[in-house]
């Protein structure tokens, strides 16, 4: 019977260890998920426009929409005129849409929301460009080619050597002048 108790105790101990391992794993998983959600929220928060920018953007979008609706009305009017026999130049239709497009783009592109979005885009592109540049410099270094920093350092040394050479030449000229006297 003591053997049965021993097996039962070992079983209980093993199940308890497994439960603890699962609990620890779940706790680590929850921490990782919380960190991910927090990171994601921070990233999303940076992309959400300010309330004023959002309102300005919506206002610009609404004005652009009105431009397109006005253009559609003009197109219907001119189409009706053409259907009633009036001689309508097809270039008028093109001009209506081009004018409307220009005005609509002005309304949208003139908003602070567009400026903010464009600023974020430029910032992201510059970061990507810097990352690509860093990667190319690392690749050059790993392949044994000189990097931009290596070339800059050599250029600085060369300039310093030229400066020193010029100073030595001036001293030599003074010595030669003194010997000639």
UniProtKB/Swiss-Prot annotation:
InterPro entries named in the record: PHA_synth_III_E (IPR010123)
Pathway membership, UniProt: Biopolymer metabolism; poly-(R)-3-hydroxybutanoate biosynthesis
Designated name of the protein: Poly(3-hydroxyalkanoate) polymerase subunit PhaE
GO molecular function, one term: acyltransferase activity
Broad enzyme group: transferase
Keyword Transferase: yes
Subunit and partners: Heterodimer with PhaC.
EC number assigned by the record: 2.3.1.-
Assigned keywords, A-Z: Acyltransferase, PHA biosynthesis, PHB biosynthesis, Transferase
Domain of life: Archaea
GO process annotations (BP): poly(3-hydroxyalkanoate) biosynthetic process; poly-hydroxybutyrate biosynthetic process
Role of this protein: Involved in the production of polyhydroxyalkonic acids (PHAs), which are water-insoluble biopolymers used as intracellular energy reserve material when cells grow under conditions of nutrient limitation. PHAs are composed primarily of 3-hydroxybutyric acid (3HB) and 3-hydroxyvaleric acid (3HV). Required for the production of poly-beta-hydroxybutyrate (PHB) and poly(beta-hydroxybutyrate-co-beta-hydroxyvalerate) (PHBV).
Family statement drawn from the similarity comment of this UniProt entry: Belongs to the PHA/PHB synthase family.
Biotechnology remark: PHB and PHBV are desirable bioplastic due to their biodegradability, biocompatibility, and mechanical properties. However, PHBV has better mechanical properties than PHB.
């Amino acid at each position: 019977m003591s053997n049965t108790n021993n097996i039962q105790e070992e079983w209980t101990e093993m199940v308890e260890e497994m439960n603890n391992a699962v609990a620890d794993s779940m706790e680590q998983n929850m921490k990782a998920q919380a960190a991910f959600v927090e990171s994601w929220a921070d990233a999303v928060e940076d992309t959400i426009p300010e309330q004023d920018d959002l309102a300005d953007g919506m206002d610009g979008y609404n004005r652009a929409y009105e431009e397109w609706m006005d253009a559609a009305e003009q197109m219907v009017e001119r189409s009706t005129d053409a259907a009633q026999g009036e001689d309508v130049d097809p270039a008028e239709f093109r001009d209506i849409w081009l004018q409307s497009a220009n005005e609509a783009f002005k309304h949208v592109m003139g908003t602070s929301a567009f400026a903010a979005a464009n600023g974020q885009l430029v910032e992201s592109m510059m970061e990507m460009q810097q990352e690509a540049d860093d990667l190319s410099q690392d690749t050059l270094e790993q392949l044994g080619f000189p990097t931009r920093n290596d070339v800059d350092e050599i250029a600085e040394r060369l300039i310093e050597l030229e400066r020193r050479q010029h100073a030595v030449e001036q001293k030599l000229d003074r010595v030669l002048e003194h010997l000639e006297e």
